Every structure is written in structure tokens, then in C-alpha cells.
Amino acid sequence: MKVLFVIGSGAKHLEEEISRHGNLINVEIKKFPDGEKYVRVLERGKEAIVIQSTYHPQDENLIEALLLGDALSEAGFKKLKIVIPYLAYSRQDRVTKEGEPISVRAIMKMLGLYYDELYVFDIHNPKTLEHFPGIAKNIYPAEAIANYFKDKLGEGLILAPDKGALERAKRVAEVLGLEYSHFEKERISPTEVRMKPVDVDVNGKNVLIVDDIISTGGTMIKAANILRELGAKEIFVVATHGVFAEGAIERVSKAVNELAVTNTIPTEVSKISIVDYIVKLGEKE
């Protein structure tokens, strides 16, 4: 049977594609005159998957996710999953100054009040999923990224912008059967730090730089400039989440041959779809 999907306001850009694979539950979502959210589920069922990304406006989309969970429970749904393509507050995963919250922990606990299972895409720190009281899984779209770039890279290589992102580069490289490595920072003077790729020769090769989030794009631009100096042929940049600061798309695009992100957040360079991963969750029903 087809799974029942609920599309939140933060995932409207995925609605058309998802509707081809599953039944959409009819819900009414609007605002009261004072700005508060109104949610009403217009159908009945037993199990449902809510899809709600929590990019800007983050707080509004998070509240809506909670209201959808409560409304579905009131409507008689007994098992609820939520897919959050981009989870807000996920980078606030530790206390850096006394008196701060662990914001992502608070979000996880609230979601756990209504949802049995939580699925996120390429969360900043996968260990934070331990705060969710039910089943929680991190999905990394390595296959989708690899399939998009396979005909562009040839016998190229995959690079992570730092060691922390190496696992992402590894997973894409393994799908493509290509070499992978990462950049490291080398201090060349008391005031200057230089990035360099570790143990790989990029001269004459196409290179794909892989990361989880692009915001300002400064790291990617710096990495691309270094690769140019080292003789790289074509340079591609990809991230799961395009959290672009103003002007970032233009700046990064000028520095590389192509910039692409997935559609966890809708942007003008969201060229890689995550919908197949979401649909597979429904097929397990």
C-alpha cells in the first residue's frame, strides 16, 4: 500500500515530487490574524510520515511540526514518523558559555512528544540524535550526490574541506570508485594559515569538494583557489544543505566550475533530489 505523507509548509517544494510516490493527507495550515499557526488534519488513518524542513522561518516551522504531530494523534493516527530534511538548531549541540542550552537537545525532546521515529539528512553531529527518545536516523545522500556528478568527474577525486568532513567524501568516493582525501591547515607563519590537500595529487584532475553545509562559502572559495594553484582541472562543490548567506551563491559559483546542493532547502542551485530516500521510508510500511 502507499504510505500516507503529510507535507508541512517547510517542505512544499518537495510536494509535487512526493505526490507521485504516495498518498498525501489533506491538511489545512494557515495563520490566525495574530500570527499563530492553525493546523487541521482532514483525513483519518493509522500511520503517517510528516515531512517538514525547518529552515527559515525556523521557529515557525518547528512549531508547525509539533502541531501536526498533535493533530494527527487527535485524528487517530497511532504511528508517526517525521522526516526533517534540514534540522534547525543542529549546530547548537554543546555548551560553549556557562548558562547556554544545548538547543538541539531541546528540539529533539519536543519532537519526541509526538513522533515515534525521526529521520534527518546529514545532521551536523550525528551523536545529537541520541537525545531523541524514539528511533532516530541520519541519512546521508551519497548515492544521489555521486549519481549527479559521475559523468562530470571522470577519473577525478573527492575532497573534504577538513578532516571532520572526511566521512562524507569517503562515502561519495566509494559509490564512484574514486580516490578521496581532505584538506588540512598548515601554519606557515605566526599570522598565516594555509590549507592543503593531504596525500593526493590534484594536478590535471577534476575535483569534487563535499561538505554538509555551505553558509558564507568562504572555506569552499579558499579551497577552490588552492586547487587552481595546484593545477586542478575542473572544480565542483557540493553540500547537502544550502544555507546560503546573501551573495554566497554568486561568490562560490564564480570560484568553481559548478556549485550544487540537495533540495533539503530550496535554492537556485538545489539540483540534487532527496525524495527517493523519503519514499523508501514509506515503502518499509
Swiss-Prot record:
Keywords: ATP-binding, Cytoplasm, Kinase, Magnesium, Metal-binding, Nucleotide biosynthesis, Nucleotide-binding, Transferase. Involved in the biosynthesis of the central metabolite phospho-alpha-D-ribosyl-1-pyrophosphate (PRPP) via the transfer of pyrophosphoryl group from ATP to 1-hydroxyl of ribose-5-phosphate (Rib-5-P). Its main location: cytoplasm. Mg(2+) 2 binds at residue 162. This is Ribose-phosphate pyrophosphokinase. Its cofactor is Mg(2+). The active site is at residue 185. One of its GO terms (cellular component) is cytoplasm. Pathway: Metabolic intermediate biosynthesis; 5-phospho-alpha-D-ribose 1-diphosphate biosynthesis; 5-phospho-alpha-D-ribose 1-diphosphate from D-ribose 5-phosphate (route I): step 1/1. It comes from the Archaea. Mg(2+) 1 binds at residue 124. Belongs to the ribose-phosphate pyrophosphokinase family. Class III (archaeal) subfamily. It catalyses: D-ribose 5-phosphate + ATP = 5-phospho-alpha-D-ribose 1-diphosphate + AMP + H(+).
